[in-house]
């Protein structure tokens, strides 16, 4: 298939600039795999579509406030780093601005001067390896103090509260972007879901900025996916196996949870406790081996994420649903409304 097959026209005013308030007041488009029907609901209505014995799998990764502004030493020139991933120990891969002026050996101080770093190496893609002279725990404390959330480029409004870009169950620091399908959940909604006999299990996948990288190739199978680190605990793996064995549904909350489960199922033939890196690319024609349903947001045209949704729900039906979403003025992208496929 071609990249252009996944294009749709989206009015700019439908790109959400802030989350729904309260979170579960977002709209929910419900797509039935049984009869192809489309229903228009509110996210807090989600429990009506869940059955006792179902298992929701959420991504508990937490976004690092990883965008930090500093000054070069000794010139005092302003610069910016965005921490992308931990390479080893105190060394991180970073996006640097202005990159050309931050050559190896450049020293930078941040905040009140207690956070310092030095550029070690420039990579082929222009990113930098940077060493921070702190252990990981101390660095995270400094980022909490000085850092800003690395919001997607299509969100131009500043957050009133940085917690707006975290899920209520986020706990494992490491993402450069939020697993946004989970932003719609509130503690009260999760309690309601559990009270219905529906389980909630956690996996971890640290979302990289590659999630925003556009597909450049015309033929989608020529696209090379970015790699992201994931982890599945023994408890979660066992709950998923038991759910499947009992004939109940495993519903992924977000494309990151989906990619984690499908990567492990494809690699091992079952869900097992493990961790590693995945660059799995799910597009029409690729078979799913674990999930039975998906909760997700409305994604960018020609993105790998709309391709993933098309792989699960079907290309024609997915593009038709997006057309309806535009007509019905759903809110799109990270802070937008949600879709449930069951």
Residue spans of the language-model regions?
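Surface-exposed, charge/polar-rich loops and edge strands
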Residues: 1-342
């Amino acid at each position: 298939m071609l990249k252009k097959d996944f294009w749709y026209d989206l009015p700019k005013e439908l790109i959400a600039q802030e989350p729904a308030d309260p979170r579960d007041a977002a709209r929910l488009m419900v797509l039935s795999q049984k009869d192809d029907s489309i229903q228009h609901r509110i996210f807090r209505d989600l429990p009506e579509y869940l059955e006792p014995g179902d298992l929701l799998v959420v991504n508990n990764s937490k976004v690092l406030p990883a965008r930090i502004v500093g000054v070069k030493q000794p010139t005092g020139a302003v610069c910016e780093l965005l921490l992308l991933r931990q390479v080893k120990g105190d060394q991180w891969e970073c996006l640097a601005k202005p990159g050309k002026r931050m050559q190896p050996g450049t020293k930078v101080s941040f905040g009140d001067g207690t956070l310092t770093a030095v550029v070690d190496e420039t990579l082929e893609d222009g990113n930098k390896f940077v060493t921070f002279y702190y252990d990981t725990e101390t660095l995270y404390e400094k980022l909490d103090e000085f850092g800003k959330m690395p919001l997607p480029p299509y969100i131009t409004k500043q957050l009133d509260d940085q917690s707006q870009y975290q899920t209520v169950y986020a706990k494992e620091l490491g993402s450069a972007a939020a697993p946004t399908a989970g932003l719609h959940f509130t503690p009260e909604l999760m309690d309601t879901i559990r009270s219905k006999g529906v389980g909630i299990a956690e996996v971890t996948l640290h979302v990289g900025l590659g999630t925003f990288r556009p597909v450049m190739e015309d033929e989608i199978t020529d696209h090379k996916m970015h790699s992201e680190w994931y982890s599945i605990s023994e408890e979660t793996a066992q709950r998923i196996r038991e759910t499947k064995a009992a004939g109940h549904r495993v519903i992924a909350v977000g494309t990151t949870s989906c990619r984690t489960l499908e990567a492990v199922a494809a690699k091992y033939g079952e869900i097992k406790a493990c961790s590693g890196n995945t660059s799995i690319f799910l597009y029409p024609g690729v078979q799913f081996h674990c999930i039975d349903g998906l909760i997700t947001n409305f994604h960018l045209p020609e993105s790998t994420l709309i391709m993933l949704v098309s792989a699960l729900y079907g290309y024609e039906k997915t593009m038709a649903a997006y057309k309806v979403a535009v007509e019905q003025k759903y809110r799109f992208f990270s802070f937008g409304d949600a879709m449930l496929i069951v």
